[in-house]
């Protein structure tokens, strides 16, 4: 039983440490880093009609990316053309 618990703990530590945390410097142009604390990934900037978040100085996005150029993120958090 103790061996099984030890194996589970080691497996969990390896899985957590092997995930790559994305930051704004790691995502290519046209992408942003979005998601929760443990599940951040690079996603494309939002297009018209897609869910978005307004740009912020911290490049910290939880639910979606800012809009592509020429669009704004409306108050209801969807991209629309200017």
Swiss-Prot record:
The keyword Disulfide bond applies. Its main location: secreted. It is found in: Secreted. One of its GO terms (cellular component) is extracellular region. Expressed by the venom gland. Residues 1-18 form the signal peptide. The keyword Secreted applies. Keywords: Disulfide bond, Secreted, Signal. Disulfide bonds join 22-33, 27-42, 32-65, 52-73, 67-79. Belongs to the u-CNTX family. Non-toxic to mice and insects. This is Peptide 1.
């Amino acid at each position: 039983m103790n061996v099984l618990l030890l194996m589970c703990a080691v497996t969990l530590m390896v899985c957590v440490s092997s995930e790559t945390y994305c930051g704004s410097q790691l995502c290519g142009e046209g992408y942003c880093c979005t998601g929760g604390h443990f599940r951040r990934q690079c996603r494309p900037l939002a297009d018209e009609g897609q869910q978005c978040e307004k740009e912020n100085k911290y490049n910290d996005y939880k639910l979606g990316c800012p809009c592509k150029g020429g669009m704004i993120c409306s108050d209801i958090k969807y991209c629309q053309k200017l």
